Amino acid sequence: MIAMAGISGMDQDKQEAFEELVGPAGSARERLLLLAARRVHRTKSKLRGTVRKRIPFLLPTRGPLSDVDGGIDMSLHVLSRDPLVLYVPIGGARPLYPLAALGRRLAARRVTFLTMQTWTMERPAVIARMGRDLAWYAGRFPLHEIIFLCNTEEERRLIAAAGGNAIFSNHNLMVSEEIFRPLPDVPVEFDAVYNGRISPIKRHHLAFDIERLAHITYSIGELPPVAARAFVRRLQAQSPLHKIANPLVDGWPGKLTAQQVNRVYNQAAVGLCLSAVEGAMYSSMEYLMAGLPIVSTPSLGGRDVYFDPDYCIVAEPERAAIRRAVETLLDRAIPREEIRRRTLEKVGTQRIEFMAFLTALLRRKGSRGPLIETWPFPGTDGMMRRGTVREIAAFVSEPEPT
């Protein structure tokens, strides 16, 4: 074993999480290469992230420097063009940076931003920084309004205390029950399924003691390719009864459609949620709409908002505890349609409340349109328009389709 001098505290925790993810290296040389690749990748990512999150707050509204941040990637959904209401994902240590970049390009227009928190805001340092950024934004763009749609009541309270306009509206309301549903003709082949990207935060290793397990996984670039492939190899080596549902090309997991993901859910008896901290976790709602009971670890972020103790168990983050919880739910054998029905009752109530809020918002902004009585969002699959800030600003400025 190579000594890891100089690693302590949180860095040690991150190192252990990384090694749990990729597994033991085959040799000292391979281990060194993995660690070196990870260090280089993290350094580059941190530098890019720092630039991306700071630059939008520093640029002038007009002039040759105003478009320096035009290449930053972002996504949004246009809820209404007149009045202009935009649904925008935000997250990270400086959550308002995409609004700062897009807001400068829409400074002369009245805009309402509805923000979706992709990562929990229940973090004091992030809230404190965001409070200062909110004050800056209000002074810079007086025609704009930002409304935070919060995944938990605690998140709403913290954002409101920092000066934000916030309501409780968990983003898992956006998951489509038309796509994620029970499929009676699909036989159950796995005790559990885990839909989790390639990331140390997802703690895939906690599921390794489950006898029959399906993985749905993908990369968003959090790890260098050499480490991501090592992760895939580790999953493959666990057991002949563990399967990666994604197609693999040169050791790399390909993308599944939402319909294919739902089919994999229906091949499993239980859905897994194993991270300690993240956002509200779309897949937790996808499981429930497909009729799967859930085994979760204690978590921060809002995925437990729709949990029910009859079919959701929060277990300690230990392999044996996760396995036992899965076995308990297998024994309960709660019908899928029952889980789905009870979930949709909760979702339906909150959607009605949110539609009433949206109707009042549009009226306040000058709309003369009818009441919103049908759910106006198309589901998470394909809902977001993605592009650079420059492209998104041009798209938002297009006239209303006739």
Residue ranges: model-predicted function:
Residues M1-D133, S299-G302, V314-A315, R364-I372, ...:
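N-terminal pre-catalytic "stem/leader" segment of glycosyltransferase-like enzymes
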Residues G91, L96-K202:
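Catalytic core of nucleotide-activated saccharide and alditol-phosphate transferases
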Residues L173-A258, N262:
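Conserved catalytic-core segment of nucleotide-activated headgroup transferases in glycan assembly
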Residues N262, S284-M289, R303-D304:
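Short alpha-helical segment that forms part of, or immediately flanks, the ligand-binding pocket
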Residues R263-G279:
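Acidic donor-binding loop of glycosyltransferase active sites
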Residues P293-T297:
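Short hydrophobic beta-strand element within catalytic cores of glycosyltransferases
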Residues P317, R323, L330-E391:
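A charged, aromatic-enriched C-terminal amphipathic alpha-helix characteristic of glycosyltransferases
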